[in-house]
C-alpha cells in the first residue's frame, strides 16, 4: 500500500497535535506563593535554593539605563540550601494584577545588583533588581522559567487591627 505524501503529512500533523495536547502543562497549583519578604524554594533534583524578594517599589536609583516607563526595584536574595546554585536573575519578573509583566533588567549591570556567580552550599547573594514599568503598577514578583511560573511573591495581607482593651471601671 502506498501512502500519499499529503496523507502522510496530515497524519504526522495530527499525531503532533495529539502529542502537544497531551503534554503536561504547569498549572497555578505548581506555583509556590509567598508574601514578599518570605523565602520560596526552587528545587532541581537534589539542588535547592531559596529566593527571597523584598521591597517592590518605584526606584530613585541612578542606573545606566533610561526607562521608557517608570523604574521599579526590589531586593532579591538567593541562597544555596542544598548543593550549589546559580542565580538566574533573568527569570525574575514584576507583575501587575491585570497580568502586565515586566522583565527584570538583567542586562543592566549595577554595583548594587545580584551577583550571578555560582554559589556553594550555604552561600547567598543579595542585590537589587530593576524593572521598566510601562503599564499597570506591579504588585508581585514572579520567577518564571521556560514560560512556567515557579515562584510568586505577593504583597502580604494587611495586618489585623490591634485589639483594644477598654479601661476597667474604677471603683
Regions found by a protein language model. Give the residues of each.
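Conserved functional micro-motifs across diverse proteins
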Residues: 2-171
Amino acid at each position: 500500500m502506498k501512502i500519499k505524501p499529503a496523507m502522510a503529512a496530515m497524519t504526522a500533523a495530527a499525531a503532533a497535535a495529539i502529542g502537544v495536547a497531551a503534554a503536561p502543562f504547569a498549572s497555578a497549583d505548581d506555583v509556590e506563593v509567598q508574601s514578599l519578604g518570605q523565602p520560596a524554594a526552587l528545587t532541581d533534583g537534589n539542588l535547592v535554593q531559596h529566593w527571597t524578594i523584598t521591597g517592590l517599589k518605584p526606584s530613585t536609583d541612578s542606573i545606566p539605563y533610561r526607562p521608557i516607563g517608570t523604574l521599579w526595584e526590589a531586593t532579591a536574595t538567593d541562597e544555596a540550601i542544598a548543593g550549589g546554585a546559580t542565580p538566574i536573575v533573568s527569570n525574575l519578573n514584576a507583575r501587575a494584577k491585570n497580568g502586565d509583566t515586566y522583565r527584570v533588567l538583567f542586562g543592566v549591570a549595577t554595583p548594587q545588583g545580584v551577583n550571578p556567580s555560582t554559589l556553594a552550599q550555604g552561600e547567598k547573594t543579595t542585590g537589587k533588581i530593576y524593572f521598566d514599568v510601562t503599564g499597570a503598577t506591579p504588585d508581585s514578583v514572579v520567577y518564571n522559567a521556560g514560560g512556567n511560573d515557579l515562584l510568586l511573591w505577593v504583597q502580604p495581607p494587611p495586618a489585623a487591627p490591634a485589639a483594644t482593651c477598654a479601661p476597667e471601671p474604677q471603683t
